[in-house]
């Protein structure tokens, strides 16, 4: 064996078996086969145990990974099954729930507007007994100017029926006074009635003038009744 060949063997660049086979090739052709057989037998007898462990470890790790994946898949399947089983129960519970509210209306939430007040039922005024209706006095006024409208308003405000005789007024002032009397009766919830062409009767809300008295007024009996 040459020095360079030995150095290569020492450095691991050249295998020693190849060197031996090369040296024996010239003497015996069967030596190469024997050395080959010996090397294979040597590898079988004195093979590296680490190589076998590495080769066997690969399938084990793969089997371990496969088993872990199978367990994870089984767990996820159980979770999905549990979720699917819970969903119908949740839906059923949600469908059974009901909201109960108090049917009693709250008076604090009632807001009055102009439309509501117009449509709201008005309180019915109590009927005055017949004997009380007779307890009134009719005041007769003969205004000559529009300035006497204040006197008419004061009597009517005190609950006294007023007969307005406009025969002594001119046409323009008479119309103005009639308009005033109509507004006064409407504002105080009373009534205004035409007795003759220029005679009007103002009745307060709590006084009901009888038909007999109205007939006397129409005949010209402008007097006070007690």
From Swiss-Prot:
Pfam families: SepF. Residues 45-56 have a biased composition (Acidic residues). GO terms for cellular component: cytoplasm. One of its GO terms (biological process) is division septum assembly. Residues 22-44, 62-95 have a biased composition (Basic and acidic residues). The keyword DNA repair does not apply. Keywords: Cell cycle, Cell division, Cytoplasm, Septation. Its main location: cytoplasm. It is found in: Cytoplasm. Residues 20-116 are annotated as: Disordered. InterPro entries: Cell_div_SepF, Cell_div_SepF/SepF-rel, SepF-like_sf. Residues 97-111 have a biased composition (Polar residues). PANTHER family: CELL DIVISION PROTEIN SEPF. Belongs to the SepF family. Cell division protein that is part of the divisome complex and is recruited early to the Z-ring. Probably stimulates Z-ring formation, perhaps through the cross-linking of FtsZ protofilaments. Its function overlaps with FtsA. Homodimer. Interacts with FtsZ. This is Cell division protein SepF.
């Amino acid at each position: 064996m040459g020095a360079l060949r030995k150095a290569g063997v020492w450095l691991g660049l050249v295998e020693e078996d190849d060197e031996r086979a090369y040296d024996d090739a010239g003497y015996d052709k069967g030596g190469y086969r024997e050395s080959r057989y010996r090397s294979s037998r040597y590898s079988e007898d004195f093979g590296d145990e680490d190589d076998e462990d590495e080769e066997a470890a690969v399938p084990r790790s793969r089997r371990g990974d496969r088993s872990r994946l199978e367990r994870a898949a089984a767990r996820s399947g159980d979770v999905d099954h549990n979720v699917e089983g819970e969903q119908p129960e949740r839906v059923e519970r949600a469908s059974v729930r009901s909201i109960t509210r108090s049917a009693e209306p709250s008076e604090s939430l009632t807001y009055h507007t102009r439309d509501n007040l117009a449509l709201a039922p008005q309180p019915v005024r109590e009927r005055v007994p017949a004997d009380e209706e007779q307890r009134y006095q009719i005041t007769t006024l003969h205004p000559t100017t529009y300035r006497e409208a204040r006197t008419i308003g004061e009597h009517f405000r005190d609950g006294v029926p007023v007969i307005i005789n406009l025969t002594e007024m001119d046409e323009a002032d008479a119309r103005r006074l009639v308009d005033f009397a109509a507004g006064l009766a409407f504002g105080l919830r009373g009534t205004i009635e035409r007795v003759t062409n220029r005679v009007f009767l103002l009745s307060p809300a709590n006084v009901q003038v009888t038909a007999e008295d109205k007939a006397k007024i129409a005949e010209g009996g402008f007097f006070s009744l007690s």
